[in-house]
Amino acid sequence: MQKSILFIVVLLILATTITAQSKDEKTIRAVLTNQTNAWNQGNLQNYMQGYWQNDSLMFIGKSGITYGWQKTLENYKKGYPDTAAMGKLKFELLAVNKLSANYYFVVGKWNLVRSIGNVGGTFTLLFRKIKNTWVIVSDHSS
């Protein structure tokens, strides 16, 4: 009898943990879906809502390291001044790995289908749960 109760308790703990992990991963995937939708509507301001709105946000790209949400937004506006330059964005997630209760590491590919020529590359994202919200705190895209 005690073994049965212990087994049930262990199963309940595991089920709770798995559910919490699945909920976090689904939320992170939803952030990326929202970013894709905003991009494809030509709305960089909404696209940036997936990022940590802080001066410590780190973005690493072909121009080097950029710190800060506002500076990252300005760089996006310079690099993608209109919807022709933005094209249509698609993410392909290769890995979504939990590092701890408050951090996830995401690896994927990005692709822009554009009338002026398609481009694409790879990315790594560090998501952090801040004030109960998952946001990108570091983005390395190439």
Predicted segments — roles?
Residues 4, 8-50, 71:
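Short, low-complexity N-terminal intrinsically disordered segments enriched in polar/charged residues
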Residues 44-99:
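A solvent-exposed, acidic/Ser-Thr-rich amphipathic alpha-helical stretch
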Residues 52, 63, 95, 109-110, ...:
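A mature extracytoplasmic/lumenal domain signature
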Residues 76, 91-97, 110-112, 122-128:
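Hydrophobic/aromatic beta-strand elements that line small-molecule binding cavities or substrate pockets
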Residues 83-84, 112-119:
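Short, cysteine-centered beta-strand-loop-beta hairpins and adjacent loop/turn segments enriched
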Residues 101-110:
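A short hydrophobic beta-strand element
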Residues 120-142:
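Short beta-strand edge/turn micro-motifs at domain boundaries
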